[in-house]
Curated annotation (Swiss-Prot):
Subunit structure: Monomer.
Enzyme class: hydrolase
GO cellular component, one term: cytosol
Catalytic-site annotation from UniProt: C14, H62, D78
Documented EC number(s): 3.5.1.122
Protein name (Swiss-Prot/TrEMBL): Protein N-terminal glutamine amidohydrolase
Family the entry assigns: Belongs to the NTAQ1 family.
Function: Mediates the side-chain deamidation of N-terminal glutamine residues to glutamate, an important step in N-end rule pathway of protein degradation. Conversion of the resulting N-terminal glutamine to glutamate renders the protein susceptible to arginylation, polyubiquitination and degradation as specified by the N-end rule. Does not act on substrates with internal or C-terminal glutamine and does not act on non-glutamine residues in any position.
Entry superkingdom: Eukaryota
Protein's UniProt keywords contain Cytoplasm: no
Reaction equations catalysed: N-terminal L-glutaminyl-[protein] + H2O = N-terminal L-glutamyl-[protein] + NH4(+)
Keywords linked to the UniProt accession: Hydrolase
Provenance organism: Caenorhabditis briggsae
Length: 185
């Protein structure tokens, strides 16, 4: 695995950061997943994120990488977290998803997760970065220097984070299901 410092990174472009990380890991992708996190209201509470000094942040979506080894152990790679790169899933879950603090949020804030095998993510994701444009056409945050990621369509990122939509070879899970999927056997 690359260190976080060795992996391509641009702040506020988590979907592309994960894509570029997985691209660098080819051909050894069998144990890796891109995990898109969002919900119906596009407001997901997460903790331990670098973007805020407050303990929590509300993102419209977030994308991370998780590896699931043959022994059942899982590690999380989140470019935007204060938690260690390659931390075990349970530690990441406890600190970032923070179920104790989540109790103060209404049900509509519950997160959903689209689990995409790495190879599928590399052939599926297309982003024209239009979601990062202001009304005047300028970028809200500086875009990455690498070219746009375009596969089968001009842009499907907003569809991928819509957890009601179905995509072949992807799985949408709730908080209980993802914990079960990535917890040690």
């Amino acid at each position: 695995m690359l260190s976080a410092e060795e992996a391509p990174y641009q702040s506020c472009y988590c979907e592309e950061n994960v894509y570029k990380l997985l691209e660098k890991l080819k051909p050894n992708l069998d144990d890796f997943f891109a995990v898109l996190i969002s919900n119906d209201i596009k407001m997901i509470p997460l903790w331990k994120q670098k973007a805020e000094r407050d303990p929590d942040v509300l993102w419209d979506y977030h994308v991370i990488t998780i590896s699931k080894n043959s022994d059942g152990s899982a590690k999380v790679y989140d470019f935007d977290s204060w938690i260690d790169w390659g931390v075990d899933f349970q530690t990441y879950w406890n600190q970032t998803m923070n179920e104790d603090e989540m109790k103060q949020f209404r049900e509509k804030y519950r997160r959903k997760f689209r689990i995409i095998p790495a190879r599928i993510y590399l052939s599926l994701l297309s982003s024209d970065r239009s979601h990062m444009l202001n009304p005047d056409g300028t970028y809200m945050k500086p875009p990455p220097e690498w070219p746009l990621i375009q596969n089968s369509t001009n842009s499907n990122l907003m569809n991928l984070i819509d957890m009601k939509l179905e995509f072949p070879e992807t799985m949408v899970m709730d908080e209980t299901e993802i914990r079960r999927f990535f917890s040690d056997a």
